[in-house]
Amino acid sequence: MTENTHETAPNTADTDTADFDTADTDRADGAADVSTNTPNETGEAAIPELVIISGMSGAGRSTAAKCLEDLGWFVVDNLPPALIPTMVELGARSQGNVARIAVVVDVRGRRFFDNLRESLADLEAKHVTRRIVFLESSDDALVRRFESVRRPHPLQGDGRIVDGIAAERDLLRELRGDADLVIDTSSLNVHELRAKMDAQFAGESEPELRATVMSFGYKYGLPVDADLVVDCRFLPNPHWVPELRPFTGVNEEVSDYVFDQPGAKEFLNQYTELLQLIAAGYRREGKRYVTIAVGCTGGKHRSVAMSEKLSARLAAEGIETVLVHRDMGRE
């Protein structure tokens, strides 16, 4: 299955800003808000699956949590880390009614972080299946988001927003290294973030491997969350063909032009074969997701056309694919 997200990310991070979690960053009292879903009426008692959502304030933790809630997860927001094992135990006593728990953890102090490490060690000792999803974003994007909603960063104190961001990034550095999934939302709007979450968690049975194919423009920077990067700048640029310049790689005229160039089809065929080899290795290593970044100069023509074809090829090979055109609308 291929999911196309042709909505393009603007060069500022203020789209749907309120749907990212800057609005929740002033809740430092540790009070837990519990969002419940209708439980199943069947099922035996079992240890529930656990996802821990954390990351930078303003990077989209609340959006990620809402996505999981929509997918039927039992979501607990702003839960003190020390209570995570208790929540899992309560889920295990629910006789199968709570099979999947997502916990949003807001680590704002050293003691909170120590409690989280202790809780993770406790869960590991009890053989609880857990995943850590870490949401991050660039300093510039986070500053724009906080400024757009006119809220201070929870850790800035009497300083500036950038001071709070720096303090939080340093505090979360170790947790980011332990994360199973890191999502950079610097250039994503909320719809694209939801698409990424859906790619990882949607469906009753998860596929063996899920891929995000993302076209981008080198002039706007490499996607920081890319696992593999493809450079399409070896192909002639449709930008210099006047009748093609207004179009994008989604349009048939541009796609035909790109794949009529020497080496284009051969590259697509050989790279698809290479990805099949890599995918087999990822499966053996237990890797569940991969982000493939496909770049050209501006992210409008060549990379878009190649990403369209590549995502279709991967879907035909049984790899569930999300297609994102990061920079297609910037020029």
Curated annotation (Swiss-Prot):
Supply the Pfam families for this chain: PapZ_C, RapZ-like_N
Region described as Disordered: 1-43
The record's keywords, sorted A to Z, are: ATP-binding, GTP-binding, Nucleotide-binding
Key word Transcription present: no
Name a GO molecular-function annotation.
GTP binding
Which residues are listed for ATP binding in this entry?
55-62
Binding residues for GTP: 106-109
Q: Which InterPro entries match?
A: P-loop_NTPase, RapZ-like, RapZ-like_N, RapZ_C
Could you tell me which SUPFAM superfamilies the record lists for this protein? P-loop containing nucleoside triphosphate hydrolases
Homology family: Belongs to the RapZ-like family.
Relate the protein's function as given in its record.
Displays ATPase and GTPase activities.
Q: Which NCBIfam families match?
A: PRK05416.1 (NF003828)
Q: Which HAMAP family match?
A: RapZ_like
Q: Which PANTHER family did the record assign?
A: RNASE ADAPTER PROTEIN RAPZ
- In Swiss-Prot or TrEMBL terms, this protein is called Nucleotide-binding protein SGR_5570
What organism does the UniProt record list as the source? Streptomyces griseus subsp. griseus (strain JCM 4626 / CBS 651.72 / NBRC 13350 / KCC S-0626 / ISP 5235)
